[in-house]
Amino acid sequence: MPQQIELRNITLQAAQPLVHGVSLTLQRGRVLALVGGSGSGKSLTCAATLGILPAGVRQTAGEILADGKPVSPYALRGIKIATIMQNPRSAFNPLHTMHTHARETCLALGKPADDATLTAAIEAVGLENAARVLKLYPFEMSGGMLQRMMIAMAVLCESPFIIADEPTTDLDVVAQARILDLLESIMQKQAPGMLLVTHDMGVVARLADDVAVMSQGKIVEQGDVETLFNAPKHTVTRSLVSAHLALYGMELAS
């Protein structure tokens, strides 16, 4: 399995340019946070990595490399990169139980799909009574439960990399804390490389090792998390850090 995945000069376009020459490097055991405002190109960059661009959007330049060798995004999805989606409710088939979702995921990847394996993954993400959870349909579960089920799927994939696209969006404070605890636990136990897409600098401060800031489809600043928080350079980065510090009655040093 690869130790590094590199996005090199990814350029996306629809009727107009959307993402301009984005380059990022994911490394096993490290969390790279991709931050920026709504519409900055974060989710599109993830979609390009997985080969799931929306209709009408095409990649006009760039490549993806695994350990320095060019690779198709279709060869990465699931096997080498697991995904935790922004809206878990839309990620599950409403006609299938959680047991069917989990089992089909394992079978598609050639992983063990016995009930003991599925139960262990569900228990690992803190969902109680795994036997009952496996019988539930998506509409019978809360947003927080579905998000934890998405993380259980990522655990089952055993992929060396994870893309987590706004994993705490639209969750209450308690559910958000549980999701962050789970992501932290996965990093400690499995040491994948993680691309964490978020607009929440509190999440960045807690989980990230490195940060890339996007604005208007471009990477405007990159660095390790400590440097970026202590000495942000770009105006967008300074605005994000300042807003985060203001929550604690603090100001960014001039």
Curated annotation (Swiss-Prot):
Residue ranges occupied by any ABC transporter domain in the UniProt entry: 2-241
Similarity comment: Belongs to the ABC transporter superfamily. Nickel importer (TC 3.A.1.5.3) family.
The organism of origin for this protein: Shigella flexneri
Gene3D superfamilies: P-loop containing nucleotide triphosphate hydrolases
Reactions mediated catalytically: Ni(2+)(out) + ATP + H2O = Ni(2+)(in) + ADP + phosphate + H(+)
GO CC terms of this entry: plasma membrane
Location(s), subcellular: Cell inner membrane
Listed InterPro entries: AAA+_ATPase, ABC_Ni/Peptide_Import, ABC_transporter-like_ATP-bd, ABC_transporter-like_CS, Nickel_NikD, P-loop_NTPase
Protein name listed in UniProt: Nickel import ATP-binding protein NikD
